[in-house]
Amino acid sequence: MSSHGAPIPMTSSACGPLTGEARVPGDKSISHRSLILGALSVGETRISGLLEGQDVLDTAKAMRAFGATVTDHGGGEWSVHGVGVGGFAEPDGVIDCGNSGTGVRLIMGAMATSPISATFTGDASLNGRPMARVTDPLALFGAQSYGRQGGRLPMTVVGAAEPVPVTYTVPVPSAQVKSAVLLAGLNAPGQTVVIEAEATRDHTERMLAGFGAEISVEDADEGRVITLTGQPELKSQKIDVPRDPSSAAFPVCAALIVPGSDVLVPGIGLNPTRAGLFTTLREMGADLTYENERVEGGEPVADLRARFSPDLTGIEVPPARAASMIDEYPVLSVVASFARGDTVMRGVKELRVKESDRIDAMASGLRANGVAVEDGPDWWVVTGRGHGNVAGGATCASFLDHRIAMSFLVMGMATQKPVTVDDAGPIATSFPIFEPLMAQLGARIQRDNG
């Protein structure tokens, strides 16, 4: 069942060439952080190109609950009048973060070092995800948390009245955990240090520096060492949100597997901590080029051009690349189905605790559509069948996971028989215009109204 109402089954069928321009929404990671850092700064932050998916709208609502003034001016233009570091008010009601693991974890961090309490909940998917990986480091600051068995939502977090700075080594690569600790460190005196053995997306570090925080990043023997000086006065900013590479993945990958396709995806953020999928696709032999490369707001940006690539070859994806493409493995596994040979993906334990167990969700759906998959605790291997040889014909469970739903709809565009997703409703959390955008390119996606 969809997180916001009755299930919305969709079926995707083989189509003619995908052509044209795919203007995907603003980056989800940067959209969340823009609202949260705007709320923690002094003055008015103006945001252009904000992703208006449900996840980000839930974060905007949460920032209002903590006392910030958040205004939607229309057309992706938003403003946030912040309350300053340490200025969060105690919310009157429960904070509902919907489907968003990013939203709830970052907000928990942002409030954990203020002398207030907040209760968090979400949809069925989010309430099943473990939160201890965030609440454990927040406890080091002095915050307390009370949730359901297994550290799950609903959960009340009691912020530290007298927070202390923390040095924390992130055990499993996670930008959400790292960011929660850094946001908590904002209102702790002294220096908070985060050490990550493998680099994860660095939007939080870049944006904290942009808002005026004293933050340094160094490479050491133990990994990346991020040092933040607490209790700064963050200054409001003007933010232009680049378009989301995780959303761009879907029209790009669809173009690679649908014969005759030629799709341009303009203005995509190519932060090196996010661009692992595109590097991997090129190594597989994808006809994927970067055009008009530039820097906007401190982030590298380019227009992506993807063309049908009939001779894709399976590869072993370097485990060190996992953090830079963790959300893209589901759709990569779809492309791998149309390649020749094995695509080996290791070091991806994080996929087991996303919106769904993404390895299990994709493996079962791929097998149902005639593709051989092997998997283990932190790895999986997809044996490609080559262009034109993927059967399709199955109904796949989305497990309330937007990326699983979109991945199987992309698959159906090039399989012999249509592919159905049991509930595509969660797509609205990150890519509300997915269906019309893909249809405009030439995809055949139908809602199954029973």
Swiss-Prot record:
Monomer. GO terms for molecular function: 3-phosphoshikimate 1-carboxyvinyltransferase activity. One of its GO terms (biological process) is aromatic amino acid family biosynthetic process. This is 3-phosphoshikimate 1-carboxyvinyltransferase. Signal peptide: none annotated. Belongs to the EPSP synthase family. Its main location: cytoplasm. Catalyzes the transfer of the enolpyruvyl moiety of phosphoenolpyruvate (PEP) to the 5-hydroxyl of shikimate-3-phosphate (S3P) to produce enolpyruvyl shikimate-3-phosphate and inorganic phosphate. It catalyses: 3-phosphoshikimate + phosphoenolpyruvate = 5-O-(1-carboxyvinyl)-3-phosphoshikimate + phosphate. 3-phosphoshikimate binds at K28, S29, R33, S174, Q176, D327, K354. GO terms for cellular component: cytoplasm. The active site is at D327. It is an enzyme of class 2 (transferase). It comes from the Bacteria. The keyword Amino-acid biosynthesis applies. It holds the Pfam family EPSP_synthase. InterPro entries: Enolpyruvate_Tfrase_dom, Enolpyruvate_Tfrase_sf, EPSP_synthase, EPSP_synthase_CS, RNA3'P_cycl/enolpyr_Trfase_a/b. Pathway: Metabolic intermediate biosynthesis; chorismate biosynthesis; chorismate from D-erythrose 4-phosphate and phosphoenolpyruvate: step 6/7. Keywords: Amino-acid biosynthesis, Aromatic amino acid biosynthesis, Cytoplasm, Transferase. It is found in: Cytoplasm. Its EC number is 2.5.1.19. Phosphoenolpyruvate binds at K28, G101, R129, Q176, R358, R403. Residues 1-23 are annotated as: Disordered.
